């Protein structure tokens, strides 16, 4: 019984000692603060103005996500554009994300960052690209059909075999001398 009591006291002493060595704030240093979370959905113009100021936006540009129960709160609804569309030569505070300090990030930034979806406009419209692709495929199918209907072969001579045209292999009599086959003329 005394050994068990000593073991419990030892564990309690170790827990108290480790609390004094490690700062208590180290555990929560990586968590998001209360100011980083979206607030409640703005209902009045004053709440909209306060939310726009919170996200460093003008009141005219601020548009929150609809209050449909998804938990967006007062977070601004930014355009669905990828980071590719932002100026690469601008001096960004975070060049990897092409963001400045204090600028609100898109709610789905993990989808619209530079190594994922690129929403940049394409140089050609979709129907032109589809016409080019399907036109090329139709041309290749047509050419394969033409090659199948009108085959082209390299001109070849009759097959030549060594050892007097394989006389013994084709069942010739080994006691007789086969007739000499000449494959060339000089």
From Swiss-Prot:
Q: Where are the transmembrane segments?
A: 133-153
Identify its protein family.
Belongs to the complex I NDUFB8 subunit family.
Biological process, per Gene Ontology: mitochondrial electron transport, NADH to ubiquinone
Query: What organism is this sequence from?
Result: Pan troglodytes (Chimpanzee)
Task: Kindly list the GO CC terms recorded for this protein.
Answer: mitochondrial inner membrane; respiratory chain complex I
- Residues annotated as transit peptide in the record: 1-28
The chain's disulfide connectivity reads none
Q: Could you give the subunit structure recorded for this chain?
A: Complex I is composed of 45 different subunits.
Sorted keywords for this record are: Electron transport, Membrane, Mitochondrion, Mitochondrion inner membrane, Respiratory chain, Transit peptide, Transmembrane, Transmembrane helix, Transport
The protein, known as: NADH dehydrogenase [ubiquinone] 1 beta subcomplex subunit 8, mitochondrial
Its annotated function is as follows: Accessory subunit of the mitochondrial membrane respiratory chain NADH dehydrogenase (Complex I), that is believed not to be involved in catalysis. Complex I functions in the transfer of electrons from NADH to the respiratory chain. The immediate electron acceptor for the enzyme is believed to be ubiquinone.
